C-alpha cells in the first residue's frame, strides 16, 4: 500500500512544459533577480558603471526614455541594479513605457538571421540562442542591453555541487537537478541539429552559456502578456521585488501608443507611492513558494506562507481498481494517475487531498463504492471518512512518508534556526537554510495533522453509520434499530 503514496516534487519549467511543483496560481511574470529583499526605501548607493551609462544613453538615443526629464533611471542598489525614481510618484503612476520594437521575443528571433533555423524550436530555446549569438556580436543592436546582464545570479541553477549539498533532502534540490537535466537535454539537441551544422552563424556555445541564457530568461522574461509568450523588455526588467508590496494588480499592461499611433507599448506602473531617490519595486508573484523564488530569482522570504511542500500521490497501475479510481479522479478534476498537492505552512490541507487519499487507499470491503451505481456520488462520500481501516491507513502512510522525508535532511530545524539567527551567512547558504527549514516545518505540520487524526479515529463517523442514519436505522443513543416495536 505504501507504494501508492510518495512525497516528492517534479521539475517545473516554462509554460510550454506542464508545471508539477505548484497547484496554486501560476506565475504570469518573470523578472530580474535581487540577491536579497530590502525595504521599500532602499536608495541608490553608487554611481552606475560605464556599461549602465552606455545602456542609458542607448535608451535615450532610441527615444525609449526622455534624457531631459526621466521618471526613473537605472542605479546601483543592494539587489544589484534597480530603477531609481527621479521625482516623487503617486500610486499607479506610469514608471516607463517601452515600444514593442525594443522587446526581445520569438518574433525578434524570427526576423533575425537565425530565424529560419529557429522556427520549430520552443520559444525560450530560440530566444536563448538569439541572446547568445547577439552577445558574441560586437556590432549587435542589443549590445548595450546585453552588457548589463549579470553573468549569474543566486538562482540554484548556478550553484556549485558544494553549494547544492546544503539542499540535501529538499524538494528544491530535486527540482534544480531536474531543471538542469532538462536544459542540458535541450542544449544537446540543438547543438547537434542547429549549432554545429551552422558554425558560421553561431559562436562556440557551451552548456554553461546555455544555462546562463536559460537563467536570464527565467528570471527576467515577462511571460503570458497579451498575445505574447515570452518577452525580454530592456529597462523594465530592472524592476526589483519587495515583499512589503502585497498586490500584483495593475503593475503592468500592454497598450496602444495613442490615437494616431500603431505602436504597442509595455507600460509599467508603481503599485505604491515613491519618493525621489527611492527605488521603485513591484511584487513578483504572491503565489510562489520560497523554493520557486530561489530557483527563479535567487532569494527567499521570511513570510511563513512562502514555505510549501508538495505531496505527490499516485494510483498504482497494479491496483486491481486502477481504471475505476483513475476515472473517478479525472471526473473530479485530477487528471492522470498522479496528483500533486501543495501544503502551505500555516494553511489548512487542500480540499481535494483527503478525498483523493481515501480514493487511492480504497479496497477490501470498502471497494463497493467504486461500483458504477455510485459513480456520480462517490466523491461526495470520499469527502467524509469511509471506514476506520481506510482512514487509519491513510494516516499511517502519510505519517511514515513525512518521517522518511524528514530523515533525509542533514540538519534539524533547531540547527537551521540557530544558523539564521546568527546572521552573516553567505547569500546562497542563507537561501539553502531558509528553504530546508521551511520544508521541514511543513512536513512537521502535515505529520501533526495526521497524528491528531489518528487520535480521533474512534470518534469519527464512517460511511456505514451515515448510511444507517439516512435509513432511520440508528436510535438517539447511536444504537442500531433492527425492528420497530409494536
Show where each model-derived region lies.
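Charged low-complexity "KEKE/polyampholyte" interaction tracts
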Residues: 2-80, 100-114, 136-141, 202-205, ...
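Catalytic core of the SET domain in histone-lysine N-methyltransferases
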Residues: 43-82, 135-286, 322
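Residue-level marker of beta-strand positions
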Residues: 94-97, 279
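Residue-level recognition of conserved beta-strand edge/terminus positions
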Residues: 98-99, 105, 242, 283
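Conserved, structured regulatory domains from eukaryotic proteins
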Residues: 118-133, 141, 147-148
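A short, structural micro-pattern
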Residues: 121-125, 233, 303-307
Amino acid at each position: 500500500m505504501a507504494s501508492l503514496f510518495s512525497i516528492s516534487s517534479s521539475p517545473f519549467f516554462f509554460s510550454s512544459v506542464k508545471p508539477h511543483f505548484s497547484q496554486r496560481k501560476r506565475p504570469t511574470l518573470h523578472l530580474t533577480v535581487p540577491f536579497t529583499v530590502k525595504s521599500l526605501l532602499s536608495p541608490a548607493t553608487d554611481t552606475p558603471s560605464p556599461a549602465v551609462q552606455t545602456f542609458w544613453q542607448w535608451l535615450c538615443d532610441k527615444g525609449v526614455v526622455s534624457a531631459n526629464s526621466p521618471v526613473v533611471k537605472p542605479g546601483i542598489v543592494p539587489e544589484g541594479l534597480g530603477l531609481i525614481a527621479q521625482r516623487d510618484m503617486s500610486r499607479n503612476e506610469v514608471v516607463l513605457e517601452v515600444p514593442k520594437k525594443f522587446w526581445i521575443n520569438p518574433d525578434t528571433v524570427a526576423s533575425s538571421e537565425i530565424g529560419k533555423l529557429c522556427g520549430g524550436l520552443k520559444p525560450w530555446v530560440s530566444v536563448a540562442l538569439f541572446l547568445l549569438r547577439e552577445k558574441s556580436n560586437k556590432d549587435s543592436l542589443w549590445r548595450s542591453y546585453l552588457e548589463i546582464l549579470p553573468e549569474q545570479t543566486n538562482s540554484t541553477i548556478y550553484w556549485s555541487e558544494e553549494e547544492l549539498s546544503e539542499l540535501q533532502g529538499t524538494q528544491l534540490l530535486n527540482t534544480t537537478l531536474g531543471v538542469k537535466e532538462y536544459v542540458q537535454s535541450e542544449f544537446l539537441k540543438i547543438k547537434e541539429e542547429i549549432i554545429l551544422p551552422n558554425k558560421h552563424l553561431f559562436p562556440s556555445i557551451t552548456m554553461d552559456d546555455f544555462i546562463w541564457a536559460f537563467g536570464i530568461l527565467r528570471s527576467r522574461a515577462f511571460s503570458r502578456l497579451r498575445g505574447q509568450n515570452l518577452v525580454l523588455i530592456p529597462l523594465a526588467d530592472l524592476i526589483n521585488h519587495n515583499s512589503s508590496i502585497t498586490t500584483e494588480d495593475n503593475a503592468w499592461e500592454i497598450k496602444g501608443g495613442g490615437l494616431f499611433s500603431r505602436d504597442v507599448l509595455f507600460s509599467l506602473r508603481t503599485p505604491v507611492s515613491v519618493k525621489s531617490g527611492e527605488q521603485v519595486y513591484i511584487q513578483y508573484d504572491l503565489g510562489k513558494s520560497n523554493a520557486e523564488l530561489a530557483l527563479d530569482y535567487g532569494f527567499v522570504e521570511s513570510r511563513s506562507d512562502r514555505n510549501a511542500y508538495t505531496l505527490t500521490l499516485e494510483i498504482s497501475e497494479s491496483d486491481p481498481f486502477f481504471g475505476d479510481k483513475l476515472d473517478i479522479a479525472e471526473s473530479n478534476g485530477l487528471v492522470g494517475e498522479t496528483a500533486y498537492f501543495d501544503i502551505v505552512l500555516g494553511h489548512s490541507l487542500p480540499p481535494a487531498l483527503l478525498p483523493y487519499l481515501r480514493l487511492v487507499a480504497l479496497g477490501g470491503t470498502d471497494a463497493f463504492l467504486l461500483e458504477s451505481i455510485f459513480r456520480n456520488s462517490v466523491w461526495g462520500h470520499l469527502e467524509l471518512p469511509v471506514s476506520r481501516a481506510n482512514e487509519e491507513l491513510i494516516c499511517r502512510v502519510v505519517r511514515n512518508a513525512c518521517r522518511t522525508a524528514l530523515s533525509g535532511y542533514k540538519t534539524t530545524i533547531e540547527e537551521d534556526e540557530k544558523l539564521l539567527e546568527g546572521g552573516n551567512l553567505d547569500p546562497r547558504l542563507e537561501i539553502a537554510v531558509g528553504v530546508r527549514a521551511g520544508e521541514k516545518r511543513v512536513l512537521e505540520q502535515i505529520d501533526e495533522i495526521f497524528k491528531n487524526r489518528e487520535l480521533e479515529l474512534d470518534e469519527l463517523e464512517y460511511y456505514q453509520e451515515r448510511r444507517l442514519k439516512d435509513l432511520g436505522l440508528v436510535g438517539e443513543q447511536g444504537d442500531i434499530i433492527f425492528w420497530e416495536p409494536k
